[in-house]
């Protein structure tokens, strides 16, 4: 993508604006990580989670001494944000716009990991390690090579067709929303506990699309060892 960006800024933008100065490329997740600049912390652990930026879907590290040190990145196609968007599309909502509806809908579903069958089915195709790193069985996803979200194989796993926007929302749909919320919370909690252990920071700044999941954000202080959390305003 970088050569295309460079070509665009040199050709189109410069002709329109007559700008002759330098054009700097800022990494997507490093831009998200800039949330520390408006936080009250001098040192903090940093987590950015979203769909994808360049090739990174999740990145974490530490802000200290006026610099960022990234500790780990997870790359496309393995993405919690794209998983959430896939289920958003499956439930009949618009992608990149209505994920918040799925988050809200999850509260009406079965949030018990032991008894939510759709959580257990999604767990079969998503491997979450103890440090929070994750890998998807891409046989169940098509977003990495097609301009669509739910695959037929995923529909079969969830035992139903993609919901039409005007179709009634059933308890099954609510339980599926709860399942993807549970998966997301589980992965992010493991990442944060590993991040706290690695950085020894008591404060956390979190950003990115998944970082706007307010249902989970309210649980961070309860479920992790962090004592302070700063959320990047949208």
Model regions and ranges:
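Short acidic/glycine-rich loops and adjacent helix/strand connectors
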Residues: 1-234
């Amino acid at each position: 993508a970088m050569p295309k960006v460079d070509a665009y800024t040199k050709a189109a933008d410069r002709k329109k604006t007559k700008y002759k100065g330098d054009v700097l490329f800022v990494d997507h997740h490093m831009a998200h990580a800039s949330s520390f600049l408006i936080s009250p912390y001098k040192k903090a652990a940093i987590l950015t989670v979203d769909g994808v930026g360049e090739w990174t879907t999740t990145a974490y590290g530490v802000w200290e001494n006026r610099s960022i040190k990234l500790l780990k990145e997870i790359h496309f196609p393995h993405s919690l944000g794209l998983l959430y968007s896939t289920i958003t599309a499956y439930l009949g909502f618009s992608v990149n716009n209505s994920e918040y509806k799925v988050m809200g809908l999850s509260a009406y579903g079965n949030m018990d990991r032991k008894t939510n069958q759709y959580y257990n089915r999604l767990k079969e195709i998503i491997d979450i390690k103890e440090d929070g790193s994750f890998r998807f069985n891409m046989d169940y996803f098509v977003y990495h090579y097609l301009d669509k979200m739910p695959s037929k194989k995923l529909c079969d796993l969830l035992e139903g067709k993609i919901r039409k926007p005007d179709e009634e929302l059933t308890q099954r749909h609510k339980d599926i929303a709860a399942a993807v919320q549970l998966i997301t919370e589980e992965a992010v909690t493991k990442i944060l506990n590993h991040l706290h252990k690695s950085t020894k920071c008591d404060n956390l700044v979190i950003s990115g699309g998944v970082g706007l999941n307010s249902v989970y954000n309210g649980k961070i202080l309860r479920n992790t060892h962090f004592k302070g959390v700063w959320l990047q305003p949208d």
